[in-house]
Amino acid sequence: MAVTNNVLAWNREDTPVGRPFRPESLAAARAESDAGHDLPRVGGRLWCWPPVRMPETRDSRQPMTRDVAARGARIRYVEAGDGPPLVLVHDYLSSHVAWDDVVPRLSERFRVIAPDLPGFGESEKPPPSRYRYDFEAFSESLVDLCAAVGLVRVSLCGHAMGGSVALTLAATQAHLVDKLVLVNPLVYPPRPDTLSRIAGLPIVGPFIFKQLFGRALFRSRFLPRVRGGNSAPARRVDHLFELFDAPAAREAAYATMRAMLDTRPLTASIPRITTPTLVAWGRANRACPVEHGRRLARELGGARFEVFDCGPSPAEECPAAFAAVVTAFLTGGTGN
């Protein structure tokens, strides 16, 4: 603080704009004071304008949406909370909205980051000639994301295809992963569904997938997690279809589906996983039965195994129970 002609004024570093008291501002200053702002006074008189106000504070648990460049593609992600970093990786044809019911719970203990993988959600959808759309490419994008937001070591939670991406990252970048949560990951060949059968058709498969894959078939893929009287997942499915129903998105989804059909690299990577791991499964998962989860936990060297009374998406079907189990594992138990 400096004294000039018996009038006190802020030094430049003490005020947001570095301007001393100006007589013509007195009326405005009085209006601010009358409005209830706590302005500096000397001898009952105002002595500084503009007033210095404390910056507004924000609840860190309130999700914020940001963009970052990763492997040459723009990635949209949602961030909420403080604490140890936790990265949530969504399933095929999904996005960060799949975690909407658990982010408020998890952000009470963790700094949660939920990205849209390239080609999905609100992230950029580069052509397959520029982006590979396989588990390894997605995991490399997550490495870039972590570096861009200043994360040196994280816990990873991946659902279905996202679990496969998380598994790949833990196998190739073990130094980056603190703990691993695999939710119904695609590791062993699943029971074929309509979508994978279409994608595997020669010649006509790409045309059907990119041109004729409509809302009804899209919704049928998510039907198990829509049931149960919860309308929120149903609204999310419609939102996801709107994001999918564009040429670039369909091209990316088709390339990803083709890569997902071969799970042999994932199975081969299991012995390289040394990260403490929780394997979570939905008891009513028809595409990947619970026996797949038990086998994976066993082959990971005795990872913790948790079964939920739901279908393929515990985070959407039983979010409170899922968040509690994940929080307990990440803050306490070590898994394998």
Predicted regions: what they are:
Residues 1, 6-10, 17-86, 107-110, ...:
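Alpha/beta-hydrolase fold catalytic core
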